[in-house]
Amino acid sequence: MAAILLGFVVYALRLFSLQVLDYASWMDKAEEQRISQLNLPTQRGIIYDRNNVILGRNIPSYNAIIIPADLPDDPGEQQEIFRQLSALIDTPVNLGIIDSATSPFVACKSKHGIAQIAAWAASYKPFTPVPIKCDIDRRTAMRIKERAVDWPGVDVEITPVRDYPTGVFTSNIIGYLGPIYPEIEEEMRGLGFDPSRDKIGYAGIELEYQDLLGGRNGQRVVEVDVGGQVLRDMAAPAAAAPGNNIRLTIDYRLQEAAYAILVDQINFFNARVQTQDAIMTSGVVIAINPQNGEILAMVSYPSYENNRLAQVIPGDYYEQLAADATLPLLNHAVSDQVPVGSVFKIVTGVGALNEAVVTPEQIIKTPGFIQLTEKAYANDPGRPKDFVDWINRDGSHPEGLGQLDFIHGLAFSSNVYFYKLGGGYQDEVPDGLGICRLGAYARALGYATPPEVQLPAVADGLIPDPDWKRLDQGQSWTTGDTYIASVGQGLVTATPLQVLLSAATVSMGGKLMEPSIVHEILDADGNVLETYAPRLRWDLTITPTIPIFDTTSLRDCEPTGELKAIQPWVFEKVREGMRAAVTEGTLGPLSNDAPGFYVLEARGIPAAGKTGTAEYCDIYATAKGRCVPGKWPAHAWTVAFAPYDKPEIAVVAFVYNGSEGASVAAPIVRRVLQTYFEIKAGDADLGR
């Protein structure tokens, strides 16, 4: 009797706990099970080129799905449906076991059989559509629809998937999408995204403009039963807000042509090389309008097929890209930091003229080599070191390039000439520009500062100075470091875009325009919301940007606080030197490019430019044992603009391991310029 009484007491206490003490908790749980929040998918914005060519869009993707609650109750009938569906969509009826710890189900990615997915979904949310196979073709989708009566519980859902019509030609600009990664799931949920389904930008414009392109999902708050079936709306649904569209400054016609020209040139030389070490592996072409900073083309090679990453990111393909030493996922145009070679002589020339290190008419002797005493500090007795001109690299031209004035020193790209301007040389050039002033002019012309272009992962580049070398490498600055930096070698690095900006600034007489790759932001109906106006960083002939250094200070590169501008005539003389490179120098008679820039001259389009051959010794060259003193491998550079009197396009070409700028990079630039003016003429004929 006592035991029975005790049992009643325990029961009464438990009932009291359930009905009174735990009432609120149980009601909260019941409410959570009864009320559900559903996301209404938005439409991602479209990306266009400047002429409305579609570069990124949404297209329908067809997924074969099952709704477990609608499948026949009879297991035999289910199996027959699964068997017939399996034959149509090439997915096994039975495969694997779904286990949240070891083999979880992930829509569109899991390798599980139809029966396993159906059983898992039936125990999870039987009224929720679950993909069996994603991205089936339209014909297969229609056949499934036709069998709707025979296959209850089997259907097709249509979901948007990203499509990139221009593929490899623009993938380094446009980028691609990927799943929301765990670190930002909560943040993205707060913005209305569904981490189980929605994707975000992983690279390029897709990443940089995620907030504008992504839009915002709508929401429905609904009452559901225990199986997940929607019973009713609890409030008026909030409509989805579509993403904004973006119109770029890129002209896809020029972009595609520049890509083809670069690949053609690389393949041409690779077919003729004698050793594997001479293979050219990657390159960049960028074209810009120097008047407003609009980027007309930006090619980074090798590229990748972003359409292969549109539905899911295949592990094998992504691993292949990530393991590739040429880094195809990297936009080399803005992220590569490489030695720039003789294109940097533009900077040294501007600085030397403005600081009166040399006059334009002054004659400088340029033998095949000069011997300098390399010193690390004021009283250092130094060590003799030879500095060789490019024409005497193999010792066959000890006479060098002769006696040169400034115009021809730049046109012929004499190393010895610019060694003397940068570091000084005996009584001929008593006081060289020096590394402090050289760095100041480089920064003024766009080096060592990431350009404000609307792309991710834009690199800084490096203009070294004594403090940097002491802190970073634990070494003192030497006079030899200054000589080498004066010709863009040694520790000087930059991105191809920075090199292009320096030349574009000179072409415009000192106006440095910030580069832009975005022209307009539009709403989903095509109405312009924002137009990106040209942005002048500074006019170097008006805005004082060059620091004046305290020559009495014990510290290196100590500024006085005063700034000065660059005289307009300086840019005109540098322009004349770049023009002479085409008519007399490394882009003309000294070039191996036939017919060369004469093609443009014949059409009444005078051009100006500068070549560069940049020796390098990176981890890849070191691993191959190629960093032999005096025989380092080299990158190829050329930058040019046209027409000379009123520039409307400037182009840079960079070829990794390209050996020589005049032979390899110059023809690329010339052909891109030709293509631009042919497109322009064609548009004029059509009245555009």
Language model regions located:
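Short amphipathic alpha-helical signal-transduction/dimerization elements
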Residues: 507, 582, 670-681
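Short, charged, low-complexity patches
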Residues: 78, 202, 247, 251, ...
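Membrane-proximal periplasmic segments of bacterial cell-envelope enzymes
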Residues: 1-240, 252, 263-284, 290, ...
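Beta-lactam-recognizing serine transpeptidase/beta-lactamase-like catalytic domain environment
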Residues: 56, 62, 224-237, 241, ...
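Short strand->helix junction
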Residues: 71, 255, 337, 658-659
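Short, flexible loop/turn segments with low-complexity composition
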Residues: 682-688
